[in-house]
Amino acid sequence: MENGSASEGKDPSAFLSEITGAPVTVKLNSGVVYKGELQSVDGYMNIALEKTEEYVDGKLRRSYGDAFVRGNNVLYISAD
Protein backbone atom coordinates (compact mmCIF):
# COMPACT_ATOMS: atom_id res chain seq x y z
CA MET A 1 0.00 0.00 0.00
CA GLU A 2 1.10 3.56 -0.66
CA ASN A 3 1.83 5.91 2.20
CA GLY A 4 -1.28 7.71 3.41
CA SER A 5 -3.79 5.26 1.98
CA ALA A 6 -7.12 4.99 3.76
CA SER A 7 -6.59 1.29 4.44
CA GLU A 8 -3.88 2.10 6.99
CA GLY A 9 -6.56 3.12 9.50
CA LYS A 10 -5.02 6.46 10.43
CA ASP A 11 -6.61 8.65 13.07
CA PRO A 12 -8.42 11.46 11.17
CA SER A 13 -8.02 14.05 13.94
CA ALA A 14 -4.81 15.51 12.44
CA PHE A 15 -6.51 15.93 9.06
CA LEU A 16 -9.58 17.51 10.64
CA SER A 17 -7.52 19.98 12.67
CA GLU A 18 -5.61 20.95 9.50
CA ILE A 19 -8.80 21.81 7.62
CA THR A 20 -10.54 23.71 10.44
CA GLY A 21 -11.44 27.13 9.03
CA ALA A 22 -11.22 25.86 5.45
CA PRO A 23 -14.01 25.19 2.94
CA VAL A 24 -15.35 21.63 3.18
CA THR A 25 -18.04 19.40 1.74
CA VAL A 26 -20.03 17.24 4.15
CA LYS A 27 -22.19 14.48 2.68
CA LEU A 28 -24.90 12.93 4.82
CA ASN A 29 -26.19 9.36 4.73
CA SER A 30 -29.40 10.77 3.17
CA GLY A 31 -27.46 12.15 0.19
CA VAL A 32 -27.86 15.80 1.24
CA VAL A 33 -24.62 17.78 0.86
CA TYR A 34 -23.51 20.77 2.94
CA LYS A 35 -20.71 23.08 1.83
CA GLY A 36 -19.23 25.65 4.16
CA GLU A 37 -16.30 26.64 6.35
CA LEU A 38 -15.46 24.00 8.95
CA GLN A 39 -15.49 25.56 12.41
CA SER A 40 -15.26 22.49 14.64
CA VAL A 41 -15.56 18.72 14.80
CA ASP A 42 -15.84 16.69 17.99
CA GLY A 43 -15.14 13.06 18.80
CA TYR A 44 -18.64 12.06 17.71
CA MET A 45 -18.13 13.72 14.30
CA ASN A 46 -20.62 16.47 15.17
CA ILE A 47 -19.75 19.29 12.78
CA ALA A 48 -20.18 23.06 13.01
CA LEU A 49 -20.08 24.98 9.72
CA GLU A 50 -20.26 28.67 8.80
CA LYS A 51 -21.42 30.22 5.50
CA THR A 52 -23.21 26.97 4.77
CA GLU A 53 -25.07 25.95 1.62
CA GLU A 54 -27.38 22.92 1.48
CA TYR A 55 -27.58 20.93 -1.76
CA VAL A 56 -30.28 18.37 -2.51
CA ASP A 57 -29.94 16.32 -5.70
CA GLY A 58 -27.07 18.61 -6.73
CA LYS A 59 -29.18 21.78 -6.54
CA LEU A 60 -28.78 24.58 -4.02
CA ARG A 61 -31.76 24.43 -1.68
CA ARG A 62 -30.87 26.78 1.21
CA SER A 63 -28.13 28.96 2.60
CA TYR A 64 -27.40 29.23 6.32
CA GLY A 65 -25.13 31.48 8.33
CA ASP A 66 -24.26 28.68 10.74
CA ALA A 67 -25.15 24.99 10.66
CA PHE A 68 -24.67 22.09 13.05
CA VAL A 69 -24.64 18.54 11.68
CA ARG A 70 -25.06 15.62 14.04
CA GLY A 71 -22.23 13.13 13.61
CA ASN A 72 -24.30 9.98 13.17
CA ASN A 73 -25.68 11.45 9.92
CA VAL A 74 -22.24 12.10 8.36
CA LEU A 75 -21.09 9.87 5.50
CA TYR A 76 -17.89 11.83 4.81
CA ILE A 77 -16.08 15.16 5.10
CA SER A 78 -14.02 16.37 2.16
CA ALA A 79 -11.63 19.33 2.01
CA ASP A 80 -12.44 21.55 -0.99
Swiss-Prot record:
Residues 11-80 form the Sm domain. GO terms for molecular function: RNA binding. SMART domains: Sm. The keyword Signal does not apply. Keywords: Cytoplasm, mRNA processing, mRNA splicing, Nucleus, Ribonucleoprotein, RNA-binding, rRNA processing, Spliceosome, tRNA processing. GO terms for biological process: maturation of SSU-rRNA; mRNA splicing, via spliceosome; tRNA processing. The keyword DNA-binding does not apply. Its main location: cytoplasm. InterPro entries: Lsm6/sSmF, LSM_dom_sf, Sm, Sm_dom_euk/arc. It is found in: Cytoplasm; Nucleus. GO terms for cellular component: nucleolus; P-body; sno(s)RNA-containing ribonucleoprotein complex; spliceosomal complex; U4/U6 x U5 tri-snRNP complex; U6 snRNP. Disulfide bonds: none annotated. Pfam families: LSM (PF01423). Belongs to the snRNP Sm proteins family. SmF/LSm6 subfamily. Component of the heptameric LSM1-LSM7 complex, which consists of LSM1, LSM2, LSM3, LSM4, LSM5, LSM6 and LSM7. Component of the heptameric LSM2-LSM8 complex, which consists of LSM2, LSM3, LSM4, LSM5, LSM6, LSM7 and LSM8. The LSm subunits form a seven-membered ring structure with a doughnut shape. Component of LSm protein complexes, which are involved in RNA processing and may function in a chaperone-like manner, facilitating the efficient association of RNA processing factors with their substrates. Component of the cytoplasmic LSM1-LSM7 complex, which is thought to be involved in mRNA degradation by activating the decapping step in the 5'-to-3' mRNA decay pathway. Component of the nuclear LSM2-LSM8 complex, which is involved in splicing of nuclear mRNAs. This is U6 snRNA-associated Sm-like protein LSm6.
